[in-house]
């Protein structure tokens, strides 16, 4: 028995060194605690009601008040000494706040909960790995699409793919022509140059891959030749464009002239049937008189309208009107005026 008591004392000392002590238990006995509880109950029953309102409430609410719940629950081991029975320390769970110590006996406190469950490190790593795998797959697809787009589905040769990617980075098409010449190819201006370059490239590829340096130099020479030929062909191409721009105007002019001729056809017929004529008198009072040969048919007399008076005269009278003598053949003295402005109308 003595050995057991000594061992229990040693355990108590070791526990007292490790865990904090509840020092109030030394001065307060179990009987005193019971008396304090009775006094608290008596104090609760006493009401000091003066008929005043506190915040709109009259009297005292006798209902049990809500117990404040703590957001954090902590298990704290305390070693309590009992004066009546010196026994080993026991592990008890208490709450941090003093208010919750009183409410723990009446009801259990609310445990704090989180809105989202905490992820473990394994799940986080798995998710990151999946994201990296998806990104790698997307990059691989992108590179495959670029290769197939450049090589046209036949990109088995890595050198061709490399040259194609280099030309694409430089901003030039795969045919070796500049960007502006590629746009000209669409309009059909440089098809001959591109065909010649393609044939030369095919012949260079058929020679073999052992002459990489020579092929690169030949390609550069071809590019320079193509650029010079294109620069020379530019003025020649601009000339047809200018011709095409001038052609519509010429066509319009022709059409307008045709329309004018078509409109003036009846007037031309009238002029051919009624030409302008003039005559000059041989006498001292001779003068030039203009007239219009009026239309006449077979078996009718020839009449000329005088421009100065508007009278219809016979050829002999027209010659006399100009101051000439009487002649046997007056028509020989009358001249048709082809250069008069009336004929040009």
UniProtKB/Swiss-Prot annotation:
Report keywords, A-Z: Nucleus
Residue ranges, compositional bias (Basic and acidic residues) = 123-132, 222-232
What is one GO biological process annotated to this record? abscisic acid-activated signaling pathway
Q: What up-regulates or down-regulates this gene? A: Up-regulated by abscisic acid (ABA), glucose and salt.
Where does this protein have compositionally biased stretches of type Low complexity?
235-249
Which residue ranges does the record annotate as region Disordered? 114-185, 201-256
Q: A single GO CC term, please?
A: nucleus
| Localisation | Nucleus
Q: What happens when the gene is disrupted?
A: Exhibits slight hypersensitivity to abscisic acid (ABA), salt and osmotic stress.
Q: What does this protein do?
A: Acts as a negative regulator of abscisic acid (ABA) response during germination through the ubiquitin-mediated proteolysis of ABI5/DPBF1.
Subunit architecture: Forms a heterodimer with AFP2. Interacts with ABI5/DPBF1, DPBF2, AREB3/DPBF3, ABF1, ABF3/DPBF5 and ABF4/AREB2.
**Which PANTHER family does this one have?**
AFP HOMOLOG 2, NINJA-FAMILY PROTEIN AFP1
Q: Which family does it belong to?
A: Belongs to the Ninja family.
**Name this polypeptide is given:** Ninja-family protein AFP1
């Amino acid at each position: 028995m003595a050995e057991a008591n000594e061992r229990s004392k040693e355990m108590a000392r070791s526990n007292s060194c490790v865990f904090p002590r509840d020092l109030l238990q030394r001065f307060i006995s179990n009987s005193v605690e019971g008396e304090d509880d009775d006094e608290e109950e008596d104090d609760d029953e006493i009401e000091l009601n003066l008929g005043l309102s506190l915040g709109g409430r009259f009297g005292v609410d006798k209902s049990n008040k809500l117990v404040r719940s703590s957001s954090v629950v902590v298990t704290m081991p305390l070693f309590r000494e009992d004066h009546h029975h010196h026994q080993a320390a026991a592990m008890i769970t208490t709450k941090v706040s003093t208010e919750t110590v009183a409410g723990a006996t009446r009801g259990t406190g609310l445990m704090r909960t989180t809105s989202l469950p905490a992820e473990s490190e394994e799940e986080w790593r798995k998710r990151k790995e999946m994201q990296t795998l998806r990104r790698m797959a997307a990059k691989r697809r992108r590179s495959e699409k670029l290769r197939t787009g450049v090589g046209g589905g036949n990109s088995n040769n890595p050198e061709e793919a490399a040259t194609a990617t280099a030309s694409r980075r430089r901003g030039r098409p795969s045919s070796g022509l500049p960007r502006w010449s590629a746009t000209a190819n669409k309009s059909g201006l440089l098809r001959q140059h591109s065909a010649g370059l393609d044939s030369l490239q095919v012949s260079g590829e058929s020679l073999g891959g052992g002459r990489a340096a020579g092929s690169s130099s030949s390609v550069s020479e071809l590019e320079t030749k193509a650029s010079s030929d294109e620069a020379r062909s530019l003025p020649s191409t601009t000339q047809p464009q200018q011709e095409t721009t001038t052609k519509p105007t010429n066509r319009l002019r022709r059409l307008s002239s045709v329309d004018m001729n078509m409109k003036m056809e009846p007037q031309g017929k009238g002029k051919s049937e009624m030409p302008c004529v003039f005559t000059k008198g041989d006498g001292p009072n001779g003068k030039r008189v203009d007239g219009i040969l009026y239309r006449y048919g077979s078996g009718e007399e020839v009449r000329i309208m005088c421009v100065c008076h508007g009278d219809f005269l016979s050829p002999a009278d027209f010659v006399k009107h100009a101051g000439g003598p009487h002649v046997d053949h007056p028509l020989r003295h009358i001249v048709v005026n082809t250069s008069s402005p009336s004929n040009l109308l």
